[in-house]
Amino acid sequence: MMQAKSNIILASASPRRVELLSSAGIEFEVVAGDVDEGLLSGETPEDHVVRLARAKAEDVARKSGGRFYIGADTIVVCEGEIMGKPKDSADAERMLNKLSGIPHEVVTGFAVYDKERDGVITDAVRTRVYFKHLRDEEIRAYIATGCPFDKAGAYAIQGGAAYMVQKIEGSYSNVVGLPLCEVVDALRRMGAIE
């Protein structure tokens, strides 16, 4: 277990991010942030996720008494389209049809914010994901599980959509929702863990 030098708060209610950070042996608390996740005009995918990650960390920092805050945001980018979480079944079906048989990228931005020093480390990590060709009935069956609705791009690589993925290039944990290697390095650089 990595020893935290001060309390660390994950500014996310995502069970996947909680599981990933726990797997690194880091002690932390969870307090969900509440920010507008809309895309700003002219914003690149990396700028978008880093801005939201930082906003989530700073939002939670204003409301709680910890020292170090981790914010994160994940999107899928396919043929220039930025995909967040689907609005409904039709949107999930549209996203999965678009991802079917072609590569796309998962982009996660994170921020490690030190409230005491008002310092922040941010970064965005890209992972290329290759989907197999999906049949319409596969897409409908997956949507019927309810799994797509709280996930960028309407799928969870660590869950029911694992069979859809032919290969990935880059960080697996990034696709799940938190680029663990980079986040742990940032926590060390910030002095949050030993």
Swiss-Prot record:
Q: Which GO terms describe its biological process?
A: nucleotide metabolic process
Q: Where is this site: Important for substrate specificity?
A: R16, T74, Q158
- Keywords recorded for this protein, A-Z: Cytoplasm, Hydrolase, Nucleotide metabolism
The entry's localization annotation reads: Cytoplasm
Name the cofactor(s).
a divalent metal cation
Listed GO cellular component terms?
cytoplasm
Predominant subcellular localization, coarse grouping = cytoplasm
Q: What is its EC number?
A: 3.6.1.9
GO molecular function list: dTTP diphosphatase activity; UTP diphosphatase activity
Task: Give all cystine bridges in this chain.
Answer: none
Under Gene3D superfamilies, the record lists: 3.90.950.10
Q: Where is the active site?
A: D73
Q: What class of enzyme is it?
A: hydrolase
Describe the reaction catalysed, as an equation.
dTTP + H2O = dTMP + diphosphate + H(+); UTP + H2O = UMP + diphosphate + H(+)
- Provide the family line: Belongs to the Maf family. YhdE subfamily.
Q: What does this protein do?
A: Nucleoside triphosphate pyrophosphatase that hydrolyzes dTTP and UTP. May have a dual role in cell division arrest and in preventing the incorporation of modified nucleotides into cellular nucleic acids.
Q: Tell me the protein's name.
A: dTTP/UTP pyrophosphatase
> What is the species of this protein?
Geotalea uraniireducens (strain Rf4) (Geobacter uraniireducens)
Q: What is the lineage of its organism?
A: Bacteria, Pseudomonadati, Thermodesulfobacteriota, Desulfuromonadia, Geobacterales
